[in-house]
Amino acid sequence: MINLYLKEETALVKTATIYGINGPVIYLKGNTGFCMSEMVYVGKQKLVGEVIALDKDLTTVQVYEETTGLYPGEEVIATGNPVSVTLAPGILNNIFDGIERPLERIAESAGAFITRGVSVDSLDRTKKWPTHITVKQGDYLHAGDIIAEVPETHAITHKCMVPPGIEGTVLVTVADGEYTIDDLLVRLQLPDGDTKDLTMTQHWPIRTPRPTHHRFPASVPLVTGQRIIDTMFPIAKGGTAAIPGGFGTGKTMTQHQIAKWADADIIIYIGCGERGNEMTQVLEEFSELTDPR
């Protein structure tokens, strides 16, 4: 059983005050009652932070936004949940930062120079998606069973599944149609008699790996579109490759070429520690590429 300690609502809001600040790290004095890896809101602008250390009378929080202007005595509010991301149709064709804040939508509301404390939903909660329900009343479902299929793009069908740690009998299903990511699709009766409403959305802690039923062996080659790599250094689908090299030897450019031309259905580009001009190139060029399939 996977314990995610995700709470739909928190009955008692826990708060604390800032005792000290050191760059992106803040310190809270006393017994705060906060949990390790818990998401918190810091200061008047409600900057996003995460509890990274707990001592007897000192709580350490890392803030994921600029801390300039914060001062001791400002309030820190606990959410009762770990730092999590929203998994649902609409993730594809988006640009997110490391905690799934949608940078394009933030730029629309706050401008190109993103200000602190901007709160925007990660995904569009008003868009309706054509949905095909794959279960019926009376079915007994386990974690990972598919309850609905949503064509997210012309090439990718998003399969909505029962969340990990959940199983039960289907009480209610909706008819095929168009629904938002928060609309009820299936209602389950759990073994303890409670009910659980399932939507297209799952909230998942960023530090908890997604569970797998089993892994397939890496036996099919990944055609990268780069002849020297496909001939001399073949990569397997499901495998891992590394590009070592010194400064200016073309590591990033090779990565860009593989991302552009590899025989893959979905490309997830993660830029960590990249130069600003290289990320700009990714955003400009990748957005103009057309999948010939």
Predicted regions span which residues?
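N-terminal accessory targeting/assembly segments
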Residues: M1-T115
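Short, compositionally biased
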Residues: A53-T59, P89-E100, I156-G177, K196-R210
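ATP-binding Walker
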Residues: T249
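Hydrophobic anchor at the beta1->P-loop junction of P-loop NTPases
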Residues: I243
